[in-house]
Amino acid sequence: MAIEPPGTPHENTGKQLVLQKIYVKDISFESPRTPDIFSKNIAPQTQLNIKSSSKEIAPDLHEVILTLTVEAKDKDQTLFLVELQQAGVFLIRGYKTEECRALVGSYCPGSLYPFAREAVATVVSKGGFPQLLLQPINFDTLYAQALKQQASDDDSVDGQSLAGTFGEPH
């Protein structure tokens, strides 16, 4: 059996998933305490918030945006704040609605995350701080948790109920 590259239509199914474009939609770096903090011995605490959203931009074309907010603090003082929207355009064809939602909610953000990690590490280093290595994330688990949370919050799903949370259309 030959291994098909991603995006190759599966025999008899017509299913296709192709990453067409990856880009930074928005990025911001703030370091309000520089250069004073460079001369201090600090032990920063870093917090990562992550969110995914999507929209259909044409039939079978989905823009997926992975938003990361990384804040490093020492006690109550912000050392740096990074806000990043890493985006991609995905062709998703031949999948059932639920399958498409799962792809957009977990597979697509997972494909974007390595690029987002690199962008965050680069901007933090260029800001004069030690490289920040964000740990891998299981996006299947995050998506499942978001669905579970939605089900417990509201039993009536209108298709937009997860707007603003992980992996759903906005």
Where on the chain are the PLM-derived regions?
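N-terminal intrinsically disordered, cationic/polar leader segments
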Residues: 2-111, 115-170
